[in-house]
């Protein structure tokens, strides 16, 4: 494929934008470098770049675009919002409608509040949990990404009984010491951390199904035990459902798994492609939020009509009968096709697939936590990513990211993708 215009634009972007991108995940650093493709437009399941190349898209903007690009129902809602004014700074009737839709879909959301992003939603749930419990420390799980605010840019110390250390320049040591990080799916480490820090732990923050070191499900009984132990300790449980809400069913991963948290943070899908976040939970906890309580949260753009109307339209599309069954069918088809191609060419892969989301790890071993994901072959994934791009398949440029199937993907798209995988695996073996 010709990418000359993408290269020209990236060279120009480097002169004006830090690193040439507005989020480091777009830089291709995770796949060994190379020029990121600049897209011109998107429609349905397809991307079209500035050089005229067409791609089947599984990036889905890192998750929000579950209905495909430029879905007509969502486009109509956004157009209506633009015509009537995109920002008021006052209440609107639409935010009531949307709040009711979220509550009906995820019953643990007894009250909700809108924010501008998933990062803001997670950040605020932690603040509210601290206000409710009067405690300061947070337990989180290694490799789970919760946004780019200081408190969650923290990695594990030497073990569950040690304090966290900064995972980014600019995060202070004192901030990192408010966080204890333990391995996902490791109940023994979680118990140890809870025992050591006990009455200092305000909340446990967890992705109920991990989406940020690939798609990783909780082991049987893990989330149930986390809930039970946290509550016995007087700590709250916060689910970060920024990736998972409405991903696996019309509702949250908590509905899908049958394990209910005290607070939930959401984003991505619920905006229909526009920036949004939301959080909610038990009434007695949510009443700690201003103006009813002492935990402050605000935002100029929070609940803006454009994002709210886009979100309403997105949820309306997701109510289509049989949609999530189709996601499951296509996800299973992809997993099966990738595994058969890998076996044919003698390439070791593990595919973690949950409904319409999956991750392809270059390893023969199961992946159930961040350390196991980190041990997979990134060099092979980088070659695979670039090979798939040349075959017209757009993936996320990191071995840790997921593929997302949208309502716009067809069975023909899935079959074409499987053929591309077979072709790329063949070339990878030949190149060796």
UniProtKB/Swiss-Prot annotation:
What is the enzyme's main class? isomerase
The keyword Cytoplasm belongs to this UniProt entry's keyword annotation: yes
Under the GO molecular function aspect, what terms does this record hold? Answer: glutamate-1-semialdehyde 2,1-aminomutase activity; pyridoxal phosphate binding; transaminase activity
Q: What is its main location?
A: cytoplasm
* Pathway note: Porphyrin-containing compound metabolism; protoporphyrin-IX biosynthesis; 5-aminolevulinate from L-glutamyl-tRNA(Glu): step 2/2
Its recorded reaction(s) are: (S)-4-amino-5-oxopentanoate = 5-aminolevulinate
Cofactor names: pyridoxal 5'-phosphate
Membrane-spanning parts:
none
One GO biological process term is:
protoporphyrinogen IX biosynthetic process
Q: Where in the cell is it found?
A: Cytoplasm
The protein's Enzyme Commission number: 5.4.3.8
Classification via Pfam families: Aminotran_3
Where N6-(pyridoxal phosphate)lysine occurs, the residues are 268
Question: Which keywords label this protein?
Answer: Cytoplasm, Isomerase, Porphyrin biosynthesis, Pyridoxal phosphate
- The signal sequence is none
Tell me the disulfide pairings in this chain.
none
User: What domain of life does the UniProt record list for this protein's source?
Assistant: Bacteria
Q: Which PANTHER family match?
A: GLUTAMATE-1-SEMIALDEHYDE 2,1-AMINOMUTASE (PTHR43713), GLUTAMATE-1-SEMIALDEHYDE 2,1-AMINOMUTASE 2 (PTHR43713:SF1)
Sequence similarity: Belongs to the class-III pyridoxal-phosphate-dependent aminotransferase family. HemL subfamily.
Q: How does it assemble?
A: Homodimer.
Spell out the HAMAP family in the cross-references: HemL_aminotrans_3
The protein's matches in NCBIfam families, at most eight in alphabetical order, are given as: hemL (TIGR00713), PRK00062.1 (NF000818), PRK12389.1 (NF009055)
Give the protein's recorded name: Glutamate-1-semialdehyde 2,1-aminomutase 2
